Amino acid sequence: QAVYLGGGTPTALAGRDLARLITAIRRHLPLTPDCEITLEGRIHSFGLDKARAALDAGATRISLGVQSFSDAIRRPLGRKASRAEVIRFLADLVALDRAAVVVDLIYGLPGQTPEDVAEDVRLCAGLGLDGLDLYSLNLIPGTPLLTAVEKGKMLPAGPARLGAFFAAGEAAAGAEGWTPIST
């Protein structure tokens, strides 16, 4: 009923190869006729040409790891696309009107405020996205963020602060008419 091509890796493929992969999945796996095929990607390695190739092959949902729209927050994370580029790409994807378009947002990022999270959620709604996933920052071994925490260069948000981030995002989503499907 669902196939998830995740981790951002699929968008590293050429459009032709991405289409071949999705076509092979549709042809060789026992999928239901209404099977959702999600393609997770990174904006800097994804373009409308790849999106069209994936959609032509049968992808039905595109999920992008935006994390935050704020350039001040994105830059230290190594995100290559600017706020304007992210917004433009998402608007173009939505305009294709051929798949559900969703994004991942992260709260608890360095320099982020609860209002930043709320603004990101409002921006998603304003773009006409089909949904969003709101995740707490997860400090992963070997990443620059965890290294900064270990060296005392960054303090991670504590439970109360994380709660404030989540509450701001949830309130903004509710104000936009979105309802949570899981917490």
Label every model-predicted segment:
Residues 1-183:
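C-terminal scaffold of the Radical SAM
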